[in-house]
Amino acid sequence: MTELLHSLSTQNEFVARHNGPDKQEQATMLKTVNAESLDALIAQTVPAQIRLEAPMQLAPAQSEADMLATMKSFAKLNQLKRTFIGQGYYNTFTPNVILRNVMENPGWYTAYTPYQPEISQGRLESLLNYQQMVMDLTAMEIANASLLDEATAAAEAMALCQRAGKSKSNLFFVADDVHPQTIEVVKTRAAFLGFEVKVDSIDNITQQEAFGALLQYPGTTGEVRDLTDIIAKAQANKTLVTVATDLLASVLLKPAGEMGADVVIGSAQRFGVPMGYGGPHAAFMATRDAHKRTMPGRVIGVSIDAKGNQALRMAMQTREQHIRREKATSNICTAQALLANMAAFYAVYHGPQGLRTIARRAHHLTAILAAGLTKAGYELAHQHFFDTLAINTGAKTDALYQAAQQANINLRKLPNQLGVSFDETTTVADVEALFAIFGIKEEVHALSDRIATNELAAIPESCRRQSAFLTHPVFNTHHSETQMLRYMKHLENKDFSLTHGMIPLGSCTMKLNATAEMIPVTWPEFGALHPFVPKAQAAGYAALAEDLKQKLCEITGYDAFSLQPNSGASGEYAGLVAIQRYHQSRGEGHRNVCLIPSSAHGTNPATAAMVSMKVVVVKCDENGNIDMVDLADKIEKHKDHLSSIMITYPSTHGVYEQQVREVCEMVHAAGGQVYLDGANMNAQVGLTSPGFIGSDVSHLNLHKTFCIPHGGGGPGMGPIGVKSHLAPFLPGHIEGGVEGSDFAVSAADLGSASILPISWAYIAMMGADGLAEATKLAILNANYVMERLRPHYPILYRGANGRVAHECIIDIRPLKEETGISEEDIAKRLMDYGFHAPTMSFPVAGTLMVEPTESEDLAELDRFCDALIAIRGEIDKVKNGEWPLESNPLVHAPHTQADLREEKWDRPYSREIACFPSAHTKASKYWPTVNRVDNVYGDRNLVCSCPSIDSYQD
């Protein structure tokens, strides 16, 4: 390429779009941090002994247009056929108003988990709608705000049954008509919790005492039967019963809660969320009020704010890993908020009558097919069904299956049977096509007329729903597109996202989610594919996944990858399972001690507990590094039982520890494995790598380093990379392996496959040099923020040369002792300045951890630093007595528009200082919609359902 052509090329254009500071801004920032160049700063920050010796070997960077063209070539390899496989995944129509205004809207998908409720009331309301929807359709007393998928929800339900039950048994009963992928994930979880799983006919549920049982309703092959007596008998035998159910079926069927179930789980996928070759989708869990504090997952509750007005928040957070660590009953990272919101909006848009029509249509078409099959001499495995039939096809099975394939139709193949599942997209033409395949001579409309006289004949009377559902006004109001559009916009406007400003959350990497990366997610070639279609029909996904794995291996220094885990915590779990299986394969299954530094993220000990490891905490020294003497002592004490160490690099204290290689060598010498948490991978890419450092396994947070958006609290992805000796122990899957020996951790083989294009696109457009530059700029931005704030706030930890990694910790404890102003006061006051708070009290209580990422430019960094410096000035006014501790802009923060309207203002500071504390806020103001939320009130007066419509009035 000539020099002129090269200078005009768009090949590397995306790198400059993704990274915030341009060359001129970088020069200014380098001067502030007193570094001669960007490379000089990196040399002072990253230990020389772990720096990569050569650049990563990745394909040259692509322009946005070239990337999309390449992505389209992947998509075209996927074959879209009419699919009636069912098994927990169904075609659905995503209402266009939801597709465009939620799924494709950065106002919804770039928000963070609603830890800060004052700037999250919109999605909190939508998630509360989700909980109400689940509670109504399942007839249960409390529901959570989503889990990862139906299979992992079943595994969580098993753990709940063991925690909450009174049985001393070690047995968990699983009915043999539960979805096979669910059974496999339950088996994996049980194997490392020491539970025995018995898969048997539902009629044998009381042959042995079990602490819990899992039933499917309707069954995986479609059978609808009344479970009331079966559940009662099991409960009389001290067995807590979980029922996996279908939300659309629950519109017409008697809900599992009315049959006596203790726990109800399932997937909300068919409520407007594309199949996406397996995900992401929102699972649900509902239970009895008695079990609410042992239920996993986020729970949205109704509380009040400082003015006594209704305010929503995440309730019962004391169950979570960030507080209870290895004793946690829930991992707050494990959720699918964006998909739960889509499902909730689907229910709001259709309402109970719309859902009833959809359910009746799917059932009626199924009944027509059943009648036609019976007329043609076929035998149905079950006479009672909702939308799924199992047809006894015997010797004809293969021929009929192939005939369907020739007609571009996918059926579910079972031993001597074919399965057919209908959904809201099924048409009369589909039924006629199946009539042709099965040689049915009947006429569809004639059969329809006959069935209409007894429309629900295929549903036993005892299984027909009589109770009302979705009676709250929110589900009975927004049914025109105009109403729906305005309701969703009303909620969106309440929330702070990356569309408003920087979200400087430490350990969260809230970087740009570029539009080009997001575009392929909603292409039908990726979205409309069932995860269990024949492999040849998913060749595009296979090629994309394989190429992404190779890219990730090059970036991480690992030898193999699994893309199956649906979240970072799920990836941690899969990694520890791989380690334990490796030890078992060597006859060292007794190795069960996991060393975890005291600075570790709460998911680490919580995940170790999930594989029955004994957590031993390693101290950190005064500089925030692993205490090498204490580490040596712990290794020596536990060397015969040492399984692993879980470390994060750079450490959760925001520094590159000099002795990380020595840590790995010490653990290896004692027979242990090194798990390197990938949470801070954004400070490694292109400069070092987990494999080069010496670790054996890591999960990567694709929703951090590799640009999958956080979605307001999910989806995420946590693929794991391993060295070659652990590769045989990566999670398998029932569709691609032998049932019972695959150790699956998710319902689908590629987990949340439809968001993999996001990370592939990011890597492809950045190239090796762009990725390394992003890491360097993340480090520059963090050090710039640190240097600007250092004269005003204590910086808790810095590395060997006074540098931080990609984040820094501001120590508020001395200020609190001196003035009474807390880290929470500062976090809430930042909202008045137009910012989301940094991470509060992690990894050290009484601190704020700031991670600016590479995507923020100098102006935004300065706006943030100026805000914190101004807040320090406000703290000084409290210190000097100008403002009393009990009444100042910090303790009353955040301020709302309602504060401006108050007739009486008796505070010692002006309304302007309260609401417009900076020049930026006068020009462009983001308004919190409630005052500070009362967390204690919310937990003491727990309400997790939609409140009266009157309370929604502004």
From Swiss-Prot:
GO terms for cellular component: cytosol; glycine cleavage complex. InterPro entries: GcvP, GDC-P_C, GDC-P_N, GDC_P, PyrdxlP-dep_Trfase, PyrdxlP-dep_Trfase_major, PyrdxlP-dep_Trfase_small. The keyword Zinc does not apply. Its EC number is 1.4.4.2. Its cofactor is pyridoxal 5'-phosphate. Belongs to the GcvP family. This is Glycine dehydrogenase (decarboxylating). The gene is gcvP.
